[in-house]
Amino acid sequence: HREQILNMNGLRPLIKIYRFLTVFGIDPLRALNSIKGIPYYIKNFILLSRQQKSATVKFPFANLYPCLDDRFSNSGIANGHYFHQDLLVARKIFQNNPKLHVDVGSRVDGFVAHLAVFREVEVFDIRSLDININNITFTQMDLMMTGDSELFEYCDSISSLHAVEHFGMGRYGDPVNYDGYLLGLNNLYKILKINGKFYFSVPIGPQRIEFDAHRVFSMSYLLELFKDKYYIDSFSYIDDNGDLHENIQIKEKN
């Protein structure tokens, strides 16, 4: 969200510096807003303390818990890659109503949670999930390594949203493998039944690795990967400002 603010204000060169600082837990924009919030904090504390004296029901002041930058925030972040993709793909799965949907590596606290509201979903992820959630069946596995024949043509619907770009990068404890994304995509294809639906997202642009965050894929390369395996029903993307462009004609610019 804060990177999008820098984008929209024409300060994109600062994003690299901002990312570097946040790696070490330093958030300059949040720090600036927190400093701006100090006068409001003091003023409101004094006002509330005065009003407490005449209140019928008392709430005693306990530990101080300053939230100095919240007054400068919106009511949630209603844009960005994850926000739009999670809602878009959840809507499509609701409309298609598959018999068995499997998700691989997407956010449990976003997209998977959306699905769990209205249907059961099986989740495969190299990361652990330590709690039980209604409608979610979790299996910890490395999708680069799976050779389990029981999973071949296992489901009629599968998703992997902003996950494959990480395969083999080592970021989440997976073994480093330069071709990890290919192994993952091949296994996803094997898990899906013939004529099944595959919902997929990765970063797109000039092809590169931004280590150790992710890979970025060119459209031409993705189309080459998929041409003999899938028919593309629809293509949507989220731009650098976090806005969704839905059902767009594909162009191989990169």
Regions found by a protein language model. Name each.
Residues G147-I158:
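A short acidic, Gly/Pro-enriched loop at the edge of an enzyme's catalytic core
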Residues F72-A78, H166-G180, R208-I209:
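Surface-exposed cleft-lining segments at the edges of enzyme active sites
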Residues I5-L100, F111, F211-K229, D233-N254:
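N-terminal accessory regions of S-adenosyl-L-methionine
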Residues S159-V164:
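A conserved beta-strand element that flanks and buttresses the S-adenosyl-L-methionine
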Residues V176-I194:
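A short glycine-rich, Lys/Arg-flanked "PGG" loop and its adjoining helix->strand segment in the class I
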